[in-house]
Amino acid sequence: MKIIDAHLHFSNITSFKDTARDLSKLDYSSKGLWEEYRAANVVLGIAMGVTETRSDGFPDYDAATPMGLDLEGEIPENICYCPGINPYRLGPGELAELEELLSKPEVVGMKIYLGYYPFYAYDDVYKPVYELAIKYGLPVVFHTGDTYSERGLLKYAHPLTLDEVAVKYREINFMMAHFGDPWVLDGAEVLYKNRNMYADLCGLLVGTRADLQKKLDSPYFFNHLKHALAFTDDYSKFLFGTDWPLVQVQPYIDLMKELIPAEAHEDFFFNNAVKLFPKIKPFIE
């Protein structure tokens, strides 16, 4: 089975490097990613652009929009990406640069970091971003749920706050990153109600295969997620993602295979990403 990783990172972020070294125990480089993807039959990754202007600075209010992938000098050939949006840096020049970037074949959407920046999804500060999404027919990805930084503010990342923007911008398809975890039942209602809302299941855990297995063996840890998946009862709305480098690729695939019904694997691991991110088609043909 071919797999698309619909959410990973490839940026020079201190916390990502520390996580790769100390928690997930992986090689956070193009070589390391290529080796993990090859072993797991991952044919394409969709990276989420993010940058910091100083060490351990994310969320960085000074990082220029569009935030890209700056881990290395070049982006791997099997990676497309969604440039990141800093709402504090959305002046005319930055919006023009963002729009110019959207015409590139490898740019397949945009990423808004709710919770990391203190604005709700429906705030007018993001209106120019939504207008560009409509103009270019691109999906918008939102960070939702727990933030990978103590400086984040959780109220802005709650999945219920996406309902208003999903209703207002029906012509845009949105992806709720992390399914709003731990508020996944609220996220499930937003997905169930809105035809233009999807979710990825990346970043639910951090660590090695042993760390993932420990949570899977727990009688309680995934109860909230299983409840939310059953409530939604529509696996055409969910995408696979790793949030690499937070976890190793193959162990996370194996974890998701335990949680997603076998009959939905083709959609979850591949087809739904092609549907939500149509610009990736030339990269997988």
PLM regions with names:
Residues 11-13, 52-55, 88-90, 117, ...:
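Active-site environment of divalent metal-dependent phosphoester hydrolases
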Residues 24-57, 78-86, 108-109, 115, ...:
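Divalent metal-dependent hydrolysis catalytic cores, especially in the metallo-beta-lactamase
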Residues 105-109, 122-239:
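Catalytic pocket-lining loop regions of alpha/beta-barrel enzymes
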Residues 3-6, 46-48, 82-84, 111, ...:
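Active-site neighborhood of phospho(di)ester-bond hydrolases with catalytic His/Asp-centered motifs
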Residues 27-37, 90-102, 184:
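Short, acidic/polar
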Residues 58-79, 99-102, 106, 166-170, ...:
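Short, electropositive alpha-helical surface patch
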Residues 59-156:
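Active-site gating/metal-coordination segments in enzymes
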Residues 1-10, 15-44, 226-227, 231-239, ...:
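Mid-to-C-terminal alpha-helical segments outside catalytic/metal-binding sites
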